[in-house]
Amino acid sequence: EFGSYVYLGEMITNIPFPPDSPIEDRCGSCNICVDSCPTGALVQGGQLDSKKCIAFLTQTKGFLPDEYRGKIGNRLYGCDTCQLVCPENKGKDFHIHSEMEPDPEIAKPKLKPLLHISNREFKEKFGHIAGSWRGKKPIQRNAIIALAHYKDRTALPDLIKLMHEDSRPIIRGTAAWAIGRIGDQSVLFELEKALEKEQDEEVKNEIVKGIEMLKA
């Protein structure tokens, strides 16, 4: 009736219910979701390699592997590609509960304001949604990657500030990588200056990546 657009949940009760009938596997020879997955996380037989899944990757707190940064694109949290392409979901009306409909400004927020949002502002604006449970750092990291995806040069001053001043290595390093993706020779000295003072080895590695991209 609803395709795969359902919330999964559990309720503990002592009421005896008759078991449901198993759902029929209607995939057959269809491989659309397998072929459409940006990172190849889906394999034959309905198996999922969660460590490749964008829905998983966007929730991690560390540096994202290089091979997935471009594939994540502009996603801040989660990924629905497999659901969007599934023939079983075509024509399904899952807009049943208006109170569950996402606010466009929350579901697709502007990227640059996320870079400097405070903990309090983040909790007030996003604290009620599932994407906030890991805190603001993964969302900010993903916003930096999204800005690099768009090659938004107007974000360079914000990214440079993060690279020099943010206390979190993940944010400093990802910002340095993004500067390398977006910028040109005019910002090379900012990366070189950051490299001289940086103490964290992982961040240094990201700065070097940024420098190499600008020199390529």
UniProtKB/Swiss-Prot annotation:
SMART domains: EZ_HEAT (SM00567). [4Fe-4S] cluster 2 binds at C37, C79, C82. Keywords: 4Fe-4S, Iron, Iron-sulfur, Metal-binding. SUPFAM superfamilies: 4Fe-4S ferredoxins (SSF54862), ARM repeat (SSF48371). Residues 18-47 form the 4Fe-4S ferredoxin-type domain. [4Fe-4S] cluster 1 binds at C27, C30, C33, C86. GO terms for molecular function: 4 iron, 4 sulfur cluster binding; epoxyqueuosine reductase activity; metal ion binding. Transmembrane segments: none annotated. One of its GO terms (biological process) is queuosine biosynthetic process. This is Uncharacterized protein in gldA 3'region. It comes from Geobacillus stearothermophilus.
